Amino acid sequence: MSDLPRVVLFQPQIPPNTGNVARTCAATGAELHLIEPLGFSLDDRQLKRAGLDYWPWVHLHLHPGFEALRAEQQRRGGRLLALSSQADQPYHQCSFRSDDWLLFGRESDGLPPELLELAELRLTIPMAGSVRHGGGVRSLNLSVSVAVVLFEALRQLETGV
């Protein structure tokens, strides 16, 4: 496995979103860490369909809870970066590192405040149409958010992906 930022999904709920994220991770070589409980089974038909036949190339890690993920992150090193619509720092103003852990929240309500507090940095994807700016959009789709942030990190790290 190459030394790339890791994608972490906290208690994902929608199978096709996780399948799309898995496909993005397979395409980039980034590890995918899922924190339980999941809102679906890993055998879910929609999850498999969204990931197509790329599952053999997904470096998948399943954690029974956030504490298990945190222990692995601390053992392996690297920063925990939380992505949230409630954060103030735009993701593109972050200087990403190859050992970063990119933490994304649940589709329904994002990351709990206590997890946001544990992150070294809290980042957001600026949106002109967001609720914060007078629009009606609360957030982007989870799989879109992962792709936007991960590809910016890879661009900065000049991975050639």
What spans do the regions from the language model cover?
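Post-transcriptional modification and biogenesis factors for structured RNAs
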Residues: 1-161
